[in-house]
Design a protein with these regions (language model features):
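Nucleotide/phosphate-binding catalytic cleft detector across ATP-hydrolyzing
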Residues: 1-16, 20-75, 79-206, 223-225, ...
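A cytosolic small-molecule/anion-sensing beta-strand core signal
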Residues: 220
Length: 256
């Protein structure tokens, strides 16, 4: 098993931190290991204690490493929260190949061109999500690779986030001895797994209820168009049951 075939994701939630190890095999992605640990230092989806969060990350990663028998050094990290914002953008470049065939380099350049927008100093760009490509005026293209053209454009959604929560998240992961491969918007990833292509095209609302917060995402015309995080989650239901029935939290969790 080559480490080049291994992908590790890290989900840092209010109640649990999970490290999920997947393996790419002949174009198929298979989960081969999951590490989980109680989350300390997170309240309502936000980091409130760096050291406790680092220890929770380390515990989850150690658990996953023991399950699979490999050492994890690099991870994809999920991110969400009310600091996340989406805005539309447009990028355009000239096709670089002499034969005018559009390649991976052209796609990378046009996505970079879409990133050239005004961003407030307290925010930074997390990701660029292509909605459609345009080749020499021909719209509605999802994958322009291999096509012939002179001018390549992209209509994209720019995902931005607050620098403070982003840097706190990165700091925790790095202090846990891990390199960050990339940040992934959690509602976007959840939509890829939970919604069909038709559901995303026709329009859908995806609600992901966590322990301390709830992510809401709206998909339309095949892509995410809005997202928000509510500071309420499953823990609130548990606490209401415990209060109403005059019982312990553990018992209320079982009732829920």
């Amino acid at each position: 098993m080559s480490n080049n075939d291994i992908i590790v994701s890290l989900d840092i939630g209010t109640s649990k931190v999970r490290a999920i190890i997947g393996e790419m095999n002949n174009g198929t992605f298979n989960i081969i290991g999951v590490g989980s640990a109680d989350s300390e230092g997170i309240r309502k989806g936000a980091i409130v204690d760096i050291d406790q969060t680092v220890q929770s990350i380390r515990n989850a990663v150690d658990h996953a490493e023991r399950m699979v028998g490999i050492q994890i050094t690099e991870v994809y990290v999920g991110i969400s929260g009310n600091h996340i914002g989406l805005q539309n953008s447009h990028g355009v470049v000239a096709v670089s190949n002499e034969d005018r065939e559009i390649g991976e380099e052209d796609i990378e350049r046009v996505l970079k061109a879409a990133e050239v927008i005004a961003v407030p100093p307290e925010r930074e760009i997390i990701d660029v999500v292509a909605k459609q490509y345009v080749v020499d005026g021909l719209e509605g293209i999802q994958d322009p690779r291999g096509m012939i053209g002179v001018r390549l454009e992209v209509e994209a959604t720019i995902v931005t986030g607050g620098k403070t929560p982003i840097h706190n998240l990165l700091r925790c992961v790095e202090k846990g001895g891990l390199r960050i491969k990339d940040l992934v918007l959690l509602p976007l990833g959840a939509g890829q797994l939970s919604l069909s292509k038709d559901e995303k095209v026709m329009g859908s609302v995806l609600v992901d209820i966590g322990a301390g917060s709830t992510n809401v995402a709206i998909f339309q015309e095949g892509t995410i168009v809005a997202t928000s995080t509510l500071p309420i989650g499953g823990e609130f239901v548990t606490n209401d049951i415990a209060y109403g029935l005059r019982t312990l939290t553990d018992q209320a969790e079982k009732v829920k």
